[in-house]
């Protein structure tokens, strides 16, 4: 029965992944009337969203979708696989084809916020997938789309929400929240982690109070959503089933503190292109963007690794990319569950925290860090940097190595190898240093982990940009093998991270002469696997249950399934060292039922856990 369920999941997924992208949109024509309304009754919705005029919200979203439908119908049919489309003029834009990377599925309720909310049936009342709006926000964000009808001063300004009432729409120095009786221990744990994070890196005090006039009610609703900014009185923040994780909680709390989505920035077309053929019509408004008059980003660049950036396949009708990074090496970085350094910096600007640390008497931070508003003598550092002044490698797992002109190898495997989600990532920080006036070249020789938007379950981050405040390139697919990056400086931080099964990376590095063009240079090659390697993190699991008879599994688990045609075998990617199946069997006997990879004990449906 176990094998039947797993093979059913595997081949169903493979079949769905081959849907024709042009057929999905019927040559760009969206029928707005076919969009289903919420699966929840209006009476229940009115209780769930007491601060929102549901009829007005639905009409505003429908109007926005109709506007988008008109735009799309005006565009000629085209092949969207290897090209993006400019939102403003509909012109085809040739881009480097994306490497094929079939996505894994880990959680039955959905691995991403969009998947969870789609299953909850909230598509017709949430803006951009997870935001609840007040009447005033509906008016300024959705209804006032015409520049000639509403003055710039009266309109919403975002990524950080700044309307005509700013800064009174922020929380000031104190934010209050309380837990509804529906909040489970998992919700409390995830939200407390998000509270601790945002509080530690800003001047905002986030405290529990069930009596404060303005407060957030944290509860278990259907899906994940929040209001944007402080709306006065009690406002809801839902962390339903599938949302009880740090990344989602930090994202929703980011909304409550005043953040909108990164992909709605007015300048987003310079950084991502939209693949309209793959968009689920119910979520077409998710890709709405602002103008330069309505968008306020505090002068900060677009960060693909922002906690407020949706994943590349978000709102997809066919599991294919709806957003394509113009720097395609950033494709898997989008959808992160880490809070980006620019998120932290922008939140500090939005709440005027940086004004608390006078430049003359505060820490002189290195590598783009800034003084902590909690203690101006120490710095808040970009990822990959630590120490009081951001001039040291973060403590713990990792190492500092010196690059020479000869290729050297860095190899590590982190994670326990078991298909259970952990609350926190295991992290290893490496510094690769070249001699002064030389650059570092990094090549991914091997990578085994779970492949998913944002690499939220594990992967490797490589920081070669001149601006070290930006999130680095993140990878979590064996298809990324033989990717090469050349740094703009003599130091490259590398971060290996994991919180599900295991992640193994084999990286090669050497010192080279800097390129003439020092702006984010890199070279990529098609993946070539010459040695006998496992290309999936769960090969031992498949062998344990006799699944090596499958040609598909043998091709991805050559070492474990003994399907090698040469003697250059290496146990790349093995999760259970020394083939210790007795330990794996002990885990199987005492498994965590919350993340049972074989079948769901409640409805006997298979976990979608495959290549």
Swiss-Prot record:
Organism: Caenorhabditis elegans
Prosegment location in residue numbers: 18-158
Signal peptide: 1-17
Enzyme kind, highest EC tier: hydrolase
GO biological process: molting cycle, collagen and cuticulin-based cuticle; proteolysis
Active-site residues, as the UniProt record annotates them: 252
ShKT domain ranges (all copies): 532-564
Cofactor note: Binds 1 zinc ion per subunit.
Residues reported to bind Zn(2+): 251, 255, 261
Record-level Gene Ontology MF annotations: metalloendopeptidase activity; zinc ion binding
Task performed by this protein: Metalloprotease.
Record bears the keyword DNA repair: no
SUPFAM superfamilies the UniProt entry points to: Metalloproteases ('zincins'), catalytic domain (SSF55486), Spermadhesin, CUB domain (SSF49854)
Protein name (Swiss-Prot/TrEMBL): Zinc metalloproteinase nas-31
Disulphide linkage map: 203-353, 224-243, 357-376, 379-390, 397-428, 455-476, 532-564, 539-557, 548-561
Essential cofactor(s): Zn(2+)
Biased composition (Polar residues): 82-95
InterPro entries from the UniProt entry: Astacin-like_dom, CUB_dom, MetalloPept_cat_dom_sf, Metallopeptidase_nem, Peptidase_M12A, Peptidase_Metallo, ShKT_dom, Sperma_CUB_dom_sf
CDD domains according to UniProt: ZnMc_astacin_like (cd04280)
Residue ranges of domain EGF-like in the record: 340-396
GO cellular component, as recorded: extracellular region
PANTHER family named among the record's database cross-references: DISCOIDIN, CUB, EGF, LAMININ , AND ZINC METALLOPROTEASE DOMAIN CONTAINING (PTHR10127), ZINC METALLOPROTEINASE NAS-31 (PTHR10127:SF793)
Keyword terms of this UniProt record: Cleavage on pair of basic residues, Disulfide bond, EGF-like domain, Glycoprotein, Hydrolase, Metal-binding, Metalloprotease, Protease, Secreted, Signal, Zinc, Zymogen
């Amino acid at each position: 029965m176990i094998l039947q369920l797993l093979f059913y999941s595997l081949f169903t997924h493979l079949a769905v992944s081959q849907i024709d992208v042009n057929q999905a949109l019927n040559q760009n024509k969206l029928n707005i009337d076919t969009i289903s309304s919420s699966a929840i009754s209006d009476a229940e919705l009115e209780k769930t969203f007491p601060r929102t005029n549901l009829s007005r919200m639905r009409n505003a979203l429908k109007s926005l979708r109709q506007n988008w439908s008109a735009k799309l119908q005006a565009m000629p049919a085209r092949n969207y696989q290897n090209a993006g489309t400019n939102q403003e003029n509909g012109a085809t834009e040739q881009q480097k084809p994306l490497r094929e990377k079939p996505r894994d599925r880990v959680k039955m309720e959905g691995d991403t916020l969009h998947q969870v909310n789609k299953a909850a049936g909230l598509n017709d009342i949430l803006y951009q997938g997870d935001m609840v709006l007040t009447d005033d926000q509906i008016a300024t964000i959705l209804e006032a789309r015409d520049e000639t009808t509403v003055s710039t001063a009266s309109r919403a300004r975002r990524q950080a929400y700044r309307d005509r009432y700013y800064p009174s729409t922020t929380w000031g120095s104190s934010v209050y929240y309380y837990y509804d009786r529906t909040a489970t221990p998992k919700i409390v744990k995830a939200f407390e982690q998000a509270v601790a994070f945002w509080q530690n890196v800003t001047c905002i005090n986030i405290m529990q109070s069930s009596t404060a006039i303005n407060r957030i009610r944290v509860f278990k609703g259907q899906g994940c959503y929040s209001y944007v900014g402080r709306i006065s009185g009690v406002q809801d923040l839902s962390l339903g089933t599938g949302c009880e994780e740090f990344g989602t909680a930090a994202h929703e709390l980011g909304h409550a503190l005043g953040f909108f989505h990164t992909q709605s920035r007015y300048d987003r077309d310079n950084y991502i292109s939209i693949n309209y053929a793959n968009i689920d019509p119910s979520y077409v408004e998710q890709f709405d963007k602002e103008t330069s008059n309505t968008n306020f980003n505090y002068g900060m660049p677009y960060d693909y690794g922002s906690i407020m950036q949706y994943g590349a396949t978000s709102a997809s009708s066919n599991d294919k990319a709806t957003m394509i990074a113009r720097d395609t090496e950033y494709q898997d970085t989008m959808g992160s569950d880490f809070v980006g350094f620019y998120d932290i910096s922008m939140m500090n600007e939005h709440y005027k925290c940086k004004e608390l640390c006078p430049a003359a008497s505060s820490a002189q931070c290195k590598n783009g860090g800034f003084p902590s508003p909690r203690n101006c003598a120490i710095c808040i550092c970009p990822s990959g940097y630590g120490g009081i002044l951001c001039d040291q490698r973060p403590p713990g797992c990792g190492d500092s190595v010196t690059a020479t002109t000869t290729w050297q190898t860095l190899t590590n495997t982190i994670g326990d190898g078991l298909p259970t989600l952990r609350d926190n990532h295991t992290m290893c920080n490496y510094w690769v240093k070249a001699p002064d006036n030389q650059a570092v070249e990094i090549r991914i020789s091997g990578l085994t982990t779970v492949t998913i938007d944002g690499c939220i379950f594990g992967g490797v981050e490589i920081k070669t940009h001149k601006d070290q405040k930006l999130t680095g390139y993140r990878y979590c697919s064996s298809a990324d093998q033989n990717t090469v990056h050349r740094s703009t400086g003599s130091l490259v931080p590398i971060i290996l991270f994991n919180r599900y099964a295991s992640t193994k990376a084999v990286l090669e590095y050497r010192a080279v002469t800097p390129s003439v063009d020092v702006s984010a240079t890199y070279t990529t090659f098609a993946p070539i696997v010459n040695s006998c390697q496992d290309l999936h993190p769960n090969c031992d699991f498949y062998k344990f249950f006799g699944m090596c008879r499958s040609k598909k599994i043998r091709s991805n688990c050559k070492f474990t399934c003994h399907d090698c045609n040469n003697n250059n075998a290496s146990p790349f990617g093995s999760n259970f060292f020394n083939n210790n199946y007795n330990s794996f069997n002990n885990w199987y006997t005492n498994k965590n039922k919350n993340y049972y990879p074989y079948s769901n004990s409640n409805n006997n449906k298979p976990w979608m856990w495959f290549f």
